[in-house]
């Protein structure tokens, strides 16, 4: 059961000074606190909608006094020198910008650039036409008084307009240049977890095994020391924002102890079943809640305490104090 030590940080998962608790409970079920060890790789993400805003030979990651994101990553690489540090990137980068990325890899032995287009995410894809078709069939099976004729007509019209070349959920998000683009591929990267480091031609990935976990951090997270060994309920935990007397699950820091974590697969199933699914609210939030049997009858604050990833050596979500770098 949950030990008193674990409650020090809002039931967070950063107990590294003593032997780990064995289990923690939520909604009447016990979950093993699984290990994310000191070799688990750290993944950052930078999807750049405007690469032209950088200098010709500059690494295309924001690095200003207000938003020192590249510095935060290189600082993490120095502190966590025994971990691989991945930077998952996407954008219309120039040859010179890709050269700058390569130089960054040479300058830091444990840093890897992982281009989105180099990663095979096809196992997580679904045809848009299949999503539309399933919802249309569900509407048609309803009695007339329960059927939404407006929605049915709209979906049938949009289904006819989907071309073969556009018939892919992943391709649809790859064309976006907004936060949904960022959030969707973050979810897929975390499904891959440590295996995403094996999706490059870089030989630095030799120490990462199939099925390994991953620690994801937004670039506004500042490391002040090593993370050590971390424990998480059934191997998954995430940042919880605590402001203005409210709490909310955040996707800015997420840890998983294995690839294809079933809580994230639950979220993917929501993305595969709704035409208007949202990568954050559905793909992460609803999926994690469903996996851990959260219902409106449960206390959301208690669920956030249960799932929270917090750590004394991470200054969390520093961009909340500034305007967005986007």
From Swiss-Prot:
Transmembrane portions of the chain = none
Enzyme Commission no: 2.4.1.-
One of its Pfam families is: SseK_NleB
The question of whether Manganese is a record keyword is answered with yes
**Which catalytic residues are annotated?**
250 (proton acceptor)
Annotated motif DXD motif, positions: 218-220
The UniProt entry's GO CC annotations, sorted and at most eight, read: extracellular region; host cell
Q: What does this protein do?
A: Protein-arginine N-acetylglucosaminyltransferase effector that catalyzes the transfer of a single N-acetylglucosamine (GlcNAc) to a conserved arginine residue of host target proteins. In contrast to NleB1, not able to disrupt TNF signaling in infected cells. Shows a lower enzymatic activity than NleB1.
The protein's name in its UniProt record:
Protein-arginine N-acetylglucosaminyltransferase NleB2
Origin organism of this chain?
Answer: Escherichia coli O157:H7
């Amino acid at each position: 059961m949950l030990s008193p030590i674990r409650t020090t940080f809002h039931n967070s998962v950063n107990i590294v000074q003593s032997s780990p608790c064995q289990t923690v409970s939520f909604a009447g079920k016990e979950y093993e606190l699984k290990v994310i060890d000191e070799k688990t790789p750290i993944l950052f993400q930078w999807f750049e909608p405007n690469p032209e805003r950088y200098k010709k030979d500059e690494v295309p990651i924001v690095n200003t006094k207000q938003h020192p994101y590249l510095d935060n990553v290189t600082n993490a690489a120095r502190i966590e020198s025994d971990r691989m540090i991945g930077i998952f990137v996407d954008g219309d980068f120039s040859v010179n910008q890709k050269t700058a990325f390569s130089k960054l890899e040479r300058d830091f032995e444990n840093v890897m650039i992982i281009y989105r287009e180099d990663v095979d995410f096809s196992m997580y894809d679904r045809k848009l036409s299949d999503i539309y078709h399933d919802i249309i069939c569900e509407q048609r099976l309803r009695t007339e008084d329960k059927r939404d004729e407006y929605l049915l007509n709209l979906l049938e019209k949009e289904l006819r307009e989907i071309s073969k070349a556009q018939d892919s959920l992943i391709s649809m998000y790859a064309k976006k240049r907004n936060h949904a683009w960022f959030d969707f591929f973050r979810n897929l990267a975390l499904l891959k977890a440590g295996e995403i480091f094996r999706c490059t031609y870089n030989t630095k990935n030799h120490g990462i095994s199939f099925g390994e976990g991953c620690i994801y951090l937004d670039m506004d997270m500042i490391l002040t020391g090593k993370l050590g060994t971390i424990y998480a309920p059934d191997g998954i935990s995430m940042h919880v924002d605590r402001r203005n007397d409210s709490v909310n699950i955040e996707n800015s820091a997420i840890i998983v102890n294995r690839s294809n974590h079933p809580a994230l697969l639950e979220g993917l199933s929501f993305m595969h079943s709704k035409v208007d699914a949202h990568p954050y609210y559905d793909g992460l939030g609803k999926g994690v809640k469903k996996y851990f049997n959260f219902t409106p009858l449960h206390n959301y604050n208690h669920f956030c305490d249960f799932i929270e990833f917090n750590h004394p050596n991470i200054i969390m979500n520093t961009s909340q104090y500034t305007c967005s770098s986007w």
